Amino acid sequence: SRNKGWKELPSWPGEPRGYAVSTTQSDGFDKCFYLFSGRNYKADGYINTLTDGYAFNPRLNSWKKLKQSFPVMAGNALSCGANHILFLGGVPQLIPGSDDHPGFDNTIRLYHTITQSLIKKEVAPYPISVTTNIAQKGNTFYVGSGEVKPGIRTPHVLKGEIIPFEKKLGIVN
């Protein structure tokens, strides 16, 4: 029956892509599906690195283009807190592979879905794998084995913890 099981949703209003990053998070009203970055293979062989982002709201059955640029292709994303998305690593641009390749981006970024602000939180002192999966249990997350340079995969698993932010009312308290 077409009323049960899988259902095709509207396509996002951007280019087709591979190596995209996605997660779910609240936009302040609804739980939405977020799609970021990726690459598009053109017919002439050119590979276009994408840094756009979109939010799909299932209640409204519509996509919204996000304001920021997201240089996180093939990286990892996870929801944290009520309205944040944490980005771990990624590929900001394609660089031809060689022994001298610097490796992929180790930047940790934080996106706020209500204010649509993206900040560079910190740079990890070790390689963050791309083209891999992330698993989360509570505030602990694991980044599985993945690629740290073109064609170089690591057997390492990274473990991280999201430390909840202490909310305060202001200077008085």
What are these regions (language model features)?
Residues 1-173:
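Kelch-like beta-propeller repeat domains
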